[in-house]
Amino acid sequence: MFKPQSIYYEKEIENYELGKELLEKYKDVPKVIIENHNNIEEMRKKENDEFPKMKQNLIIGIRKTHKFVENHKTSDFLVPYTSSGCTAMCLYCYLVCNYNKCAYLRLFVNREQMLEKIIKTAQKSEKNLTFEIGSNSDLILENTITNNLVW
């Protein structure tokens, strides 16, 4: 099971039930308050060889954009959902070279807002829609931390 070495979090997560739960769950893990989960300067400055160490961090924030991308290959929409990134260290991973800032697991605590947008989009449609929520994250890993799959 994943146990983070440090947690970087947006202060606003304290206003969400899941945010409170995660801070309590990891109360003994060192924490750093950040302005934005998407721009952690300390992480952006790290060299690629620090990739394995970066994987030991957990970032907790609020997903601010809920943009659905039309897909039409495996679903109607690709939906950024309750997490992004992972904790694995696959040798072929493109994140280390291209997105050092995203080499770690990010969890988003505003799951109610994200689910609400999916539901509203589906209700507006005249046909049944398929939303792919797992293409940019590891929902199984995430579930071991958040228990989000019940959602």
Language model regions located:
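Short, flexible loop/turn elements at secondary-structure junctions
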Residues: 11-13, 82-84, 135-137
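Short gly/ser-rich anion-binding loops that grip negatively charged ligand groups
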Residues: 76-83, 104
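A structural signal for short, well-ordered beta-strand segments and their strand-loop junctions
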Residues: 8, 33, 79, 91, ...
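Conserved Radical SAM active-site core
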Residues: 50-52, 60-72, 95-151
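Flexible, acidic/Gly-rich N-terminal and inter-domain linker regions that tether
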Residues: 1-76
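Local cysteine-cluster metal-coordination motifs and their immediate loop/turn environment
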Residues: 81-98
